[in-house]
């Protein structure tokens, strides 16, 4: 399969739920021209059970997930939503304050375009509850040529339960046959009308 691209960063601030009830989000946002890379990593238990000198069982259930994002532009709004930075009005404009408060939680997703045997599909991801941190902020001087520099975030996906008897969920995946359907699915997840 060919992975042809990634688009449509969509997010909404987490407000409540996921503890046996549906999740509520604040106002959702869908961005264009932001996604460069997404790294989805599943964390799994790795326990083996031995008897009579050989392995008779194993357990590898999912224990967590992480989402790494490389973005073309880290705006003030993204830093406030994803990292918990606080805006403060000053005489010279607005400043972003980096405080000791923990970053808030967001639901977020994106889609990637895939091609297999000539058929195009759009694989959508939605992470129910993620807490992001910035992977540093380094800058280099301009040399003979401009060097594009981007920022990366790492998000810790927390498990949620949408029903009292339900499984722990970290993220949802959905395949759509058209780009417009992929965009609509993400908007629905983020509560965007």
Regions found by a protein language model. Name each.
Residues 1-80, 131-147:
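Solvent-exposed edge beta-strands and adjacent loop segments
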Residues 57-125:
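Structured, beta-strand-rich domain cores
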Residues 13-16, 84-86, 161-162:
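Short regulatory "switch" loops immediately downstream of catalytic or recognition motifs
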Residues 4, 16-19, 25-27, 44, ...:
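Feature targets compositionally biased, intrinsically disordered low-complexity regions
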Residues 84-88, 127, 142-144, 149:
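General N-terminal targeting signals
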Residues 132-193:
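Mixed-charge, glycine-accented linear interaction segment located at domain edges/termini
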Residues 22-29, 122-130, 172-175:
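Short amphipathic beta-strand/extended segments with alternating polar/hydrophobic composition
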């Amino acid at each position: 399969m060919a992975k042809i691209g990634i688009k449509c960063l969509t997010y909404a601030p987490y407000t409540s739920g996921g503890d046996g009830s549906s999740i509520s989000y604040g106002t959702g946002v869908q961005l264009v021209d932001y996604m460069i890379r997404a790294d989805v990593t599943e964390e799994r238990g790795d326990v083996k059970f031995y008897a009579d000198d050989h392995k008779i069982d194993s357990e590898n259930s999912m224990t967590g997930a992480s989402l790494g994002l490389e973005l073309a532009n880290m705006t003030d709004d993204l830093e406030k939503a994803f990292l918990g930075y606080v805006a403060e009005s000053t005489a010279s404009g607005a400043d972003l304050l980096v405080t000791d408060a923990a970053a808030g939680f967001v639901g977020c997703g994106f889609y990637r375009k895939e091609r297999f045997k000539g058929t195009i599909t759009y694989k959508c991801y939605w992470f129910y509850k993620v807490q992001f941190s910035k992977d540093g902020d380094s800058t280099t001087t301009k040399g003979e040529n401009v060097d594009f520099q981007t920022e990366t975030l790492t998000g810790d996906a927390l498990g949620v339960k949408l029903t009292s008897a339900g499984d722990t969920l970290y993220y949802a995946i959905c395949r759509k046959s058209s780009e417009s359907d992929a965009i609509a699915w993400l908007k629905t997840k983020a509560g965007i009308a």
